[in-house]
């Protein structure tokens, strides 16, 4: 008789549940490990001797997978671009959610966004999309700036483009940015569960948004600015424009399930497809963000969920929107206090060359959640 048969029924059932949950937990813990390199771009431990020689002493690089480290080695100069893109994505995330209960908090160390990424909620969807977009955006821009040895401007668009303009200049290399972003970011995902599919979908949604927001820029040529001929190229959007689009997609995100529920004849490709939880809704497009788990309310502190709550947050007493005290403070009320602030004012430029200012003191009214 085996040891398993000697265990009480409730113990064996508990162990079975724990073992079943283990692969998903491991996959969740491995997701986003590359975010730990966020400070590499400003690290003194990274020494770059030339574009063709990098000496890396940064401990956080151990958080990368073997494939990710290989991609870094094969593309000298790209590590700073990846880290810089991640930093920009973090700033954009904080900006987009600055007036909401969840305000994209971050922490030092390998777990940049905290425990919220262990949940399959909307907030996790946005985090994956904006960080993926940040890498694609930064790498594409670095290519056109000549900061990465393995890529340049996108010179494929050449020749006449229309009756009064032609392609020229230095287009941002969005194709290289998307390809590298897909290879680098997606390789950090492990497993074949719903979380895996959700993360991959949202990663791609971030990259797709950067691509779809590309714009054509032109420069005029001709006598006295007559603009008889124009030279045009493709330019990346600002990351703020990408963040605005992704925040709108966050508000309209699709709740999903595995595809082909109840079918025993589904192929592997069909099983690895996301379908809306509500059959009346259309399937998510490549631009949409997807999630499968309801978000916490973020009102109170929870160590288990990694939520800080909204106590002490500044709110707008006259706003009915998400930044208003009623919604942001979750109905708990708010306190009002005054603060005397001294700022520079009435500044004047003197030739040549200095600026003189006065110090002005005024009273600021602050409202904070209880």
From Swiss-Prot:
Protein name, entry field: Proto-oncogene Wnt-1
Gene Ontology BP terms: animal organ regeneration; astrocyte-dopaminergic neuron signaling; bone development; branching involved in ureteric bud morphogenesis; canonical Wnt signaling pathway; cell fate commitment; cell proliferation in midbrain; cell-cell signaling
Family stated for the protein in its record: Belongs to the Wnt family.
Keyword check for Glycoprotein: yes
Organism: Homo sapiens
UniProt PTM: Palmitoleoylation is required for efficient binding to frizzled receptors. Palmitoleoylation is necessary for proper trafficking to cell surface. Depalmitoleoylated by NOTUM, leading to inhibit Wnt signaling pathway.
GO molecular function: cytokine activity; frizzled binding; morphogen activity; protein domain specific binding; receptor ligand activity
Locations listed in the record: Secreted, Extracellular space, Extracellular matrix; Secreted
Keywords: Developmental protein, Disease variant, Disulfide bond, Extracellular matrix, Glycoprotein, Lipoprotein, Osteogenesis imperfecta, Osteoporosis, Proto-oncogene, Secreted, Signal, Wnt signaling pathway
Positions annotated with a glycan in the UniProt record: 29, 316, 346, 359
Subunit structure: Forms a soluble 1:1 complex with AFM; this prevents oligomerization and is required for prolonged biological activity. The complex with AFM may represent the physiological form in body fluids. Interacts with PORCN. Interacts with RSPO1, RSPO2 and RSPO3. Interacts with WLS.
Function (record text): Ligand for members of the frizzled family of seven transmembrane receptors. Acts in the canonical Wnt signaling pathway by promoting beta-catenin-dependent transcriptional activation. In some developmental processes, is also a ligand for the coreceptor RYK, thus triggering Wnt signaling. Plays an essential role in the development of the embryonic brain and central nervous system (CNS). Has a role in osteoblast function, bone development and bone homeostasis.
Pfam families to which the protein is assigned, alphabetical: wnt
Disease linkage: Osteoporosis: A systemic skeletal disorder characterized by decreased bone mass and deterioration of bone microarchitecture without alteration in the composition of bone. The result is fragile bones and an increased risk of fractures, even after minimal trauma. Osteoporosis is a chronic condition of multifactorial etiology and is usually clinically silent until a fracture occurs. Osteogenesis imperfecta 15: An autosomal recessive form of osteogenesis imperfecta, a disorder of bone formation characterized by low bone mass, bone fragility and susceptibility to fractures after minimal trauma. Disease severity ranges from very mild forms without fractures to intrauterine fractures and perinatal lethality. Extraskeletal manifestations, which affect a variable number of patients, are dentinogenesis imperfecta, hearing loss, and blue sclerae.
Disulfide bridge map: 93-104, 143-151, 153-170, 218-232, 220-227, 299-330, 315-325, 329-369, 345-360, 347-357, 352-353
Record lipid sites (O-palmitoleoyl serine): 224
Superkingdom as given in the UniProt entry: Eukaryota
A cellular component term, taken from the record's GO annotations: extracellular space
Signal peptide region: 1-27
């Amino acid at each position: 008789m085996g040891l398993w048969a000697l265990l009480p029924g409730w113990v064996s059932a508990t162990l079975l549940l724990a073992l079943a949950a283990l692969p998903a937990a491991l996959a969740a813990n491995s997701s986003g490990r590359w975010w730990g390199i966020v400070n590499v771009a400003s690290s003194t431990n990274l020494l770059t001797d030339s574009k063709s020689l990098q000496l890396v002493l940064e401990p956080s690089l151990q958080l990368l997978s073997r494939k990710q480290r290989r991609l870094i080695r094969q593309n000298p100069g790209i590590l700073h671009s990846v880290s810089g893109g991640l930093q920009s994505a973090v700033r954009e995330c904080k900006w987009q959610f600055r007036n909401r209960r969840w305000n994209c908090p971050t922490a030092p160390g390998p777990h940049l966004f905290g425990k919220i990424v262990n949940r399959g909620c909307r907030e996790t969807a946005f985090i994956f999309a904006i960080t993926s977009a940040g890498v694609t955006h930064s790498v594409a821009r670095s290519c056109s700036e000549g900061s990465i040895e393995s890529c340049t401007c996108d010179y494929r668009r050449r020749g006449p483009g229309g009756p009064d303009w032609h392609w020229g200049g230095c287009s941002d290399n969005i194709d290289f940015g998307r390809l590298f972003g897909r290879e680098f970011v997606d390789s950090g995902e492990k497993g074949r569960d719903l979380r895996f599919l959700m993360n991959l979908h949202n990663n791609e949604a971030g990259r797709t948004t950067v691509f779809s927001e590309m714009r054509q820029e032109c420069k005029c040529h001709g006598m006295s600015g007559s603009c008889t001929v124009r030279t045009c190229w493709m330019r990346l959007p600002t990351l703020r424009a990408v963040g605005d689009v992704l925040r709108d997609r966050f508000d309209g995100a699709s709740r999903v399930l595995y595809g082909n529920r109840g079918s025993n004849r589904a192929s592997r490709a069909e099983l690895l497809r996301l379908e809306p939880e509500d059959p009346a809704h259309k399937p998510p497009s490549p631009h949409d963000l997807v999630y499968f788990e309801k978000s916490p309310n973020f009102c109170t502190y929870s160590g288990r969920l990694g939520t800080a709550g909204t106590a002490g947050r500044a709110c707008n007493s006259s706003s009915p929107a998400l930044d208003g005290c009623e919604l942001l403070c979750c109905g708990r009320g708010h306190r009002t206090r005054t603060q005397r602030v001294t700022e520079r004012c009435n500044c004047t430029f003197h030739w040549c060359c200095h600026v003189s200012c006065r110090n002005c003191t005024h009273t600021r009214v602050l409202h904070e959640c209880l």
